[in-house]
């Protein structure tokens, strides 16, 4: 099947040439090249690089997933792994998996840092810190679940739930650290899935009236659910028969939204709440790292491009400017003048106070730069909680060619191959069938005839 015609090539070429010409004709491009600095001299440092991987299989009644996080660097390799199953009709299953994978990476970054010695030590993470803070993996579903739980069990019990779970997390981290110190790996790093039943029995089963017999009515502020001011949600319409549109809009304006929640809704909200708290806790612990750096390979920011009024991503802009004015793709870096400040609205006030390191970072901001480690290579985004001029020499000590060797090793070492995932899944399915043949109804694979 032919996918590319001569006409398509001409059209694509014209689009890209027009963009390139817009950059070359812009009179402000010299301001950018004047900000492009040579790389500083490397400084000897100890370091760990962390990366994660996931494999997800959607079966007939279940989503089964495998997670892995690996730290490679100045000490022995450290690994966290996790296998779990969730309902396939769980509306945010993909986001839950991603959030738990990032939780593993953050946890491992924090614990690996504690094993490094010396003043000049750092942690390298793959991806961006701004992405984790500005748009968390399950946002806004996680925020909605938090507010549902808070309204359902009351502010006092919700506060007790948070404090109890955070105390469990502190104990859990000590346990994981002991296992890593002894064995270098651990296969039960996610706490939420092990305690959600116990906390449900304590805070919901014995306290929420009518929980066991049917749906529970709960009033929640409209803003907490993320509804637009003049929109009537379907669930509100369904629970408000006999009321006029004007009456419903008035109730919404007064922030009196009534929802009827079933047992599954409540359980999912609790699970989402605990997962999100565990995720935020992992970020908060990682932010204790003095020299923390994130390296992003793929990103689409337009911070510089907007200053020139051109519609291309910053990496393409930098490449075009450097090649036009210097004549080759010179190594170096460009630091963004102002730190990126995550918006506080991303986090409810009642939650942010529990995570002081996140709160401080929101006030302080995240330092950002574009870096090319070697002439002719690609440009990466560097984000750090530390000044760029301070963190860059530490990570340059571990440069190999156009990239950072520890991150490269972590990426290749953590990757879950298709073959490995299939063999592991088949072993799990066989174990389930041996335990009870009826369990096979949950693990049938609809695409198997196509493979």
Curated annotation (Swiss-Prot):
Broad class of enzyme this protein falls into: hydrolase
Domain of life of the native organism: Archaea
A Gene Ontology BP annotation from the UniProt entry: DNA repair
Cofactor needs: Mn(2+)
Keyword DNA repair annotated: yes
Activity regulation information from UniProt: Exonuclease activity is stimulated in the presence of HerA.
Keyword Cell membrane: no
InterPro entries xref list: NurA-like, NurA_domain, NurA_nuclease
Pfam families reported for this sequence: NurA
EC number: 3.1.-.-
GO molecular function, one term: metal ion binding
Annotated binding of Mn(2+), by residue: 51, 126
Keywords from the named record: DNA damage, DNA repair, DNA-binding, Endonuclease, Exonuclease, Hydrolase, Manganese, Metal-binding, Nuclease
Function, in words: Involved in DNA double-strand break (DSB) repair. Probably acts with HerA to stimulate resection of the 5' strand and produce the long 3' single-strand that is required for RadA loading. Exhibits 5' endonuclease activity and both 5' and 3' exonuclease activities.
Membership in a protein family: Belongs to the NurA family.
Assembly with partners or alone: Homodimer. Interacts with HerA.
Protein name: DNA double-strand break repair nuclease NurA
Originating species: Pyrococcus furiosus (strain ATCC 43587 / DSM 3638 / JCM 8422 / Vc1)
Gene: nurA
